Structures are given as structure tokens and as C-alpha cells.
């Protein structure tokens, strides 16, 4: 099914992709341009709605649906009503209430109202966090040591500052820790700390650099464009500090762009070269539906990895060898046809990739072609305004029985977005629709998810306020769209695009409980037969004092794109309990694969959650 929203400015379409991210792939991945030739391509969107439409049954009368209709008029009606609607949708509530923080995450409201922060990067040498306001057009910094906002620098030529209903997305922001030779000398003398700041600019189809030594900006024009959308939509940027080069890609350009820092000149395209990505594997698909996801630079093998997709149809991973100047192409299976975020592991042996429009992330071994899928926990009921975790089966602890599931759609996905490698080899990714930050440790296959305190009802399928069916007054998501890892301070910093906040996740805080699976790491189960798995939850002696909420047992699996069990069943002997009076609790998880489940290898995620975190372990499952 396709839906067409016409007469919407291209940049405003990002709103649509976030309000209904199941029907519309995140950052502008799924826009086609055409409706009988009557609508200009840059004002037309073709939205691909597949079987994984998040809460489609609930959205018709939702408040978000009303906001969507109003938002479609934003760029053509600069009226008081349009401005008010824009501010309600994108500007957050501008409060500094402590309720928007917990023992793991602290959120900070930005110095100005309605900044719409997106790109963010930790400057480890300067002990700062840098971010860009996509609305105000400022580059801001936050002092990590002093825990306060430092300074905001005005970016020149940022037209959205003057237009009350406009913005320009800055998806990627990086710190060049090496900088120029002059800058290195200044660092040695203590005159300046940290390297120059690089970031993308969608609307001006450009790359910016902020030079710390002179506190000035330079802009470099991308020497190419999209005839359909008016911008390459630069979305992912990497820096090679040894060769003084930057690499970047644009959503609407099948190209790898390489910038030679020694030759790039302010206000021009000089020093930027274009490498065309071979797209023959996408033959038969409208080129406007073929988009570039992101890149990852592999310094050990001097290569650039690129994800490319036609959402729901075809996905490929490319490796560009910078020495040989050649591409190697890796075809992906149909169920992983939407690769987005890409990260290279510590040994440069595996890629870790997020799959757009699902709850899936996976490991790809380029040498063998072997793929191992993992899945997040299922979308929390809190996203939909439900405080109580209720699953089918009349409260008997059943996780999935193919029947009713309260007001939670089986098709609700968490949307793992970007993915980054930490210094210890673990992987971080943001669950944009799940409203969580997640850490996965490949060494022990442990997934830890941290709940984002802020929720915005305008960005979710929420029940009416005052509903007496057990629904909560809090609902929705915070739109965590980008993040950066601080290796020095064991912190992860992230932006909340529609909430006017940046957040800090303190990874040093102890988890309130641990989860141990008694069974071996790999199980074989026959279809139609049940298998018991012992799970032990132990309270941490060093758990934070605030972590005293009830424990909920949770499970998910790679049987479906959302982590749902489909027609298979799984239930806990006890699903909800308190750890206030006991040090540990053992429960049994019983799993029975359905007879119609295809034989093969799957991943079962079993764990527990409280109000703040989810703690899961992965078990390999062979279904025969």
C-alpha cells in the first residue's frame, strides 16, 4: 500500500517519518517522486507501507495523525497557527524538571528555546560535548567537567533562523582529534584543546568545519546533487586522521565522497572527489527508491564500508578499498533488505548493522558471508501509554500466544538506528521508537537497554488523556536520533531532536540486577515440543538506591522483525515480582516453537526489566 502526501517541503518530511516511522522509513529513506506527473518531485512523497506497520490499527484517530495533517501545511502557511503548531511539535516543553532524569540518564534543556539538536560528538581531548541546533543554526558546547553549557557559536548563512517553521538537518558531527599541524602545535602549547569540528548540512548540501583556533567556520559545497530532491542529503561522515581525508555519503546520492583536507577551500567544492557506487544489484528498482544509509571507516584495512538499500526490497553492503580503489559487494537476504547503521568490530573481522523498520540488528562476517541476527526487547508498553505489562493468556505470564496483546500491536518495532563501537568492543545503538539507548556486548551476548526519561505524546500513538483503562499520562518517545560515546568518562551523550535537550547516560552506574541463563548457550528444539529454560535474577549489592521497582520478566526472538514470537509460544512461571525481600529469584521460561515455524537458526533473548533498564541474554536456538 502506498500513501501520498503532496505539497510538503522536502525538509518537513522528516516529521512524517518520525510520527509514523513504520509506514515511512526514517531519515528520508523512502520518498518517491511522482503522481501522474502533476506534483513536483521535491514536493511529493511516496510512502511505502509494508506488513510491519507500527500500530496501524490505532493510528486513525490518534493525536499524532492530527498533528501530521497540520504539519503538512507548515511550509506553505507561515501563520500564527502554523508557528504555534511547529513549536508544539518540535520545541519540547522547555522545562528543567528533575523528573526528566533518573539514576542512569540526566537530560539537559538547551540554552535557547526550540533548538532542535541533532548531530552530537564528544570531544575527549577538550572534555566537551558538541552539538548543532538544526533550527537556530548554532554550534554549541557542553563542559563535561563543570556540568554546564559552555558556549554557542552562530553558524553563518543558516536560513532557518529567520523562518519560524524551518530547519536544516545535521545528521553527522565529528571531532578531528588530530587537526592541522598549526592546530597540533597550539594544542601542545596549551592555547587550544581538541580538534576541529566537522558536520553535515542537508539543506545547503554542504559540509561545515569549525576551526577552534580562530573560532571561525568554513563551508564546503558538495559537487553534486539529486535532481529529484535538490540535495544529496549528506547523512554520514567519517574522518581518516592519518591521511587528512574525510569520507561522507548522502541519502539521495549513490556516491562515496572523499574530501582532501589539504586541498579543500572555503566556499567551494575544491578538494572533494566523487566515487560512484555500483548499483547494478538494484536493477529493476526505481532509482529514486535506492538510498544510501551510512558509512564506517576501517582504519586497519584502509577501507570504507557503506550500507545501501531500497527499503523492504533490496539491501547491499559495500566495501571500498582505498588502496586498490575498488568495490566489494555483499548481497543481503530479503529479510535484511534495509541496512542502515554500520560499525566495524575491534578486529576488523565483522560488521554490525541495524536493519531499518524492525527491531533487528545483526553481525556480518564478510569473509564467510555468515550472518547472525539479534533482536532488542519488544517495544515497551510505556511508549503507548500503558503502565502495566499485560500479555495474552489471562495473566499467566505468557509472552506470546498468537491472541490479543492488550493495546500493543505485534508489529510495533523499536527501530535500532545508528550503531557505534565502544573502546571495550561493545556496541551502542539508539532505539528511536523503543525510546531507549542500548549496549550489546558480543563477548557474552548481553543486551542492556536504558529507558529515556522524556516522553512526548505528540510523537506516539497514545490513548486520550484521562482514559480509565489503566493507561498512563505519559506516552510517546523523546526522538533520540543521534549519540556519541565518551571513552574517557564512560558516558554516552545523545540528542532529543523534538525535545530541545541533550542527554547523558552514565555507564559507570551499577545495574540493579543481573540475569543468568542456566541452560547452555545453544539449544535445539523440535517444532511443537516445549523446552524449559531456567533463568536466575539476582539483585546487585551495589544497586542504586532508586532502583527498587518491580521486576518484569521479558523475552523476544528473531522469529519476526519485531521480536514477537508469531505463532510460537513462550511463558514464564512467574512474570512479575519484587526483589525488595529476596536476593535472587529463579523462574522458568517455557518455549514451544509452532509447527509452521521454518526450521533453522534463531536467537532467543531472555531477561528482565525494571523501570529504568532492561537486561537480556541471547541464546542460540536451532529449530528442527
Model-derived segments and spans:
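A short helix->beta-strand "capping" segment at the edge of beta-propeller domains
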Residues: 90-114
